[in-house]
């Protein structure tokens, strides 16, 4: 099914992840958001290799909402440059994919 996206957002704190995920679901920008604790992240930031425990938000949405999600996350997130990435769905449970489309 065309237009369905999987998204990936990282947060420094569980409370922030819940705030962002709840906002996106309430605004019907995403059909579903899953929060995964204790992700070990290693990244380059301002010339230094940095290690951090992060919280991961993953979920499902439609292409029509991508820019609204990015804008919302940038407003709500404490990171200067938050990670907000989208991937296309190739296939999946058709009933679940239809539910995503109806939910957003």
Residue ranges and their predicted role:
Residues 1-104:
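Positively charged, small/polar-rich N-terminal and surface patches that mediate targeting and assembly
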């Amino acid at each position: 099914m065309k237009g369905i996206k999987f998204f990936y957002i990282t947060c420094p704190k569980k409370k922030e992840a819940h705030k962002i995920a709840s906002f996106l679901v309430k605004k019907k920008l995403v059909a579903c958001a899953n929060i995964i604790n204790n992700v070990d992240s290693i990244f380059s930031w301002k010339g230094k290799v940095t290690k951090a425990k992060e919280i991961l938000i993953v979920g499902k949405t439609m292409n029509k909402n991508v820019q609204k999600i990015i804008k919302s996350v940038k407003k709500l997130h404490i990171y200067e440059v938050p990670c907000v990435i989208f991937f296309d769905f190739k296939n999946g449970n058709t009933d679940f994919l239809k539910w995503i489309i109806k939910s957003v």
